[in-house]
């Protein structure tokens, strides 16, 4: 019999280093910091153990989604650095992100390019029928 102590784990296991809650959940966002902010923010009297993990996962997903779309916008503009303009284009061209961040103003973001179809020059791909309304 091995006396594993209070931990109940394997005795003498050197690889049992302290692991952060972010690492346990497979996240990059800080679960501990989010938990502290939820407790200090007076949102509720008590905060469950799963709430900061879930919130960190949601925030990480949203950040990854926005950064992926902004990276695509930067690549389309032949740039290697994401600027606020690329974030603006990414968010406003995505229907769901635009709905989520509809009331948000992005500094230095600019506006979406849009020209009404009536103002565009007529397409001259195919010539029109000769003498259409002129013949009487």
From Swiss-Prot:
The keyword DNA repair applies. The modification N5-methylglutamine is found at residue 108. GO terms for cellular component: nucleosome; nucleus. GO terms for biological process: DNA repair; heterochromatin formation. A motif ([ST]-Q motif) lies at residues 133-134. The keyword Methyltransferase does not apply. GO terms for molecular function: DNA binding; protein heterodimerization activity; structural constituent of chromatin. Residues 12-24 have a biased composition (Low complexity). SMART domains: H2A. Residues 1-11 have a biased composition (Gly residues). InterPro entries: Histone-fold, Histone_H2A, Histone_H2A/H2B/H3, Histone_H2A_C, Histone_H2A_CS. It is found in: Nucleus; Chromosome. Its main location: nucleus. The nucleosome is a histone octamer containing two molecules each of H2A, H2B, H3 and H4 assembled in one H3-H4 heterotetramer and two H2A-H2B heterodimers. The octamer wraps approximately 147 bp of DNA. Core component of nucleosome which plays a central role in DNA double strand break (DSB) repair. Nucleosomes wrap and compact DNA into chromatin, limiting DNA accessibility to the cellular machineries which require DNA as a template. Histones thereby play a central role in transcription regulation, DNA repair, DNA replication and chromosomal stability. DNA accessibility is regulated via a complex set of post-translational modifications of histones, also called histone code, and nucleosome remodeling. Belongs to the histone H2A family. This is Histone H2A. It comes from Mycosarcoma maydis (Corn smut fungus). The lineage of its organism: Eukaryota, Fungi, Dikarya, Basidiomycota, Ustilaginomycotina.
């Amino acid at each position: 019999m091995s006396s594993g102590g209070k931990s109940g784990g394997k005795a003498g296991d050197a690889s049992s280093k302290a692991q952060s809650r972010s690492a346990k959940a497979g996240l990059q966002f800080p679960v501990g910091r989010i938990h502290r902010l939820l407790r200090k923010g007076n949102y509720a009297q008590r905060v469950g153990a799963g709430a900061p993990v879930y919130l960190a996962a949601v925030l990480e997903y949203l950040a990854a989604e926005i950064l992926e779309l902004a990276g695509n916008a930067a690549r389309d503009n032949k740039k290697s650095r994401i600027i606020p303009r690329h974030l603006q284009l990414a968010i406003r061209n995505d229907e769901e992100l635009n709905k989520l961040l509809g009331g948000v103003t992005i500094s230095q973001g600019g506006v979406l390019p849009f020209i009404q179809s009536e103002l565009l020059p007529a397409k001259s791909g195919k010539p029109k029928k000769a003498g259409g309304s002129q013949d009487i």
